[in-house]
UniProtKB/Swiss-Prot annotation:
Species for this entry: Saccharomyces cerevisiae (strain ATCC 204508 / S288c)
Signal sequence region: 1-25
Keywords: Membrane, Signal, Transmembrane, Transmembrane helix
Membrane topology: Single-pass membrane protein
GO cellular component terms given for this protein: membrane
The protein's name: Putative uncharacterized protein YDR445C
Domain of life: Eukaryota
Note: Partially overlaps YDR444W.
Membrane-crossing segments per the record: 51-71
Keyword Membrane: yes
Subcellular location field: Membrane
């Protein structure tokens, strides 16, 4: 049975997702287009179909709906280059968590890369470099 008390949180959460999409668009295009928008992000990926975006959501605490990590991957299938941006979501904070990026790459990404043939070229040192230069 659906809990009606969760409805306001879910509506608020959908607004957070919309804001996150804007943040991702600005961040991914920061080195290409200054003052970028979600529309520019859409046009970028439409013009570059060899890039795909994968969003992985980790719920650290299901009942605290904002306590979520988003990992956004932009993967170029032609060169097998991946870019990751961890976002720690809270009601009023969108931040790039460099330490979380480093920790996650060091632990989880190695096993993920070994199971994904297209990402086997990635190594922890390279991932750490990406974390430090992603902002």
């Amino acid at each position: 049975m659906f809990n009606v008390l969760l409805l306001p949180k879910l509506i608020s959460f959908s607004n957070e997702i919309a804001l996150l999409a804007q943040s991702v668009a600005r961040m991914t295009l920061n080195h290409k287009v200054r003052g970028s928008s979600p529309l520019q992000g859409y046009l970028f990926f439409k013009q570059h179909p060899h890039f795909i975006v994968v969003i992985v959501i980790f719920l650290r605490n299901f009942y605290f709906i904002y306590d979520i990590f988003f990992y956004v991957y932009i993967i170029n299938h032609q060169t097998h280059v991946a870019f990751s941006a961890p976002f720690d979501i809270s009601p009023s904070l969108y931040s790039f968590d460099r330490s979380a990026c480093d920790d996650w790459f060091g632990s989880s990404f190695g096993s993920f890369a070994s199971s994904a043939s297209s990402l086997q070229t990635l190594d922890p040192k390279w991932c750490s470099t990406m974390c430090s230069t992603a902002t």
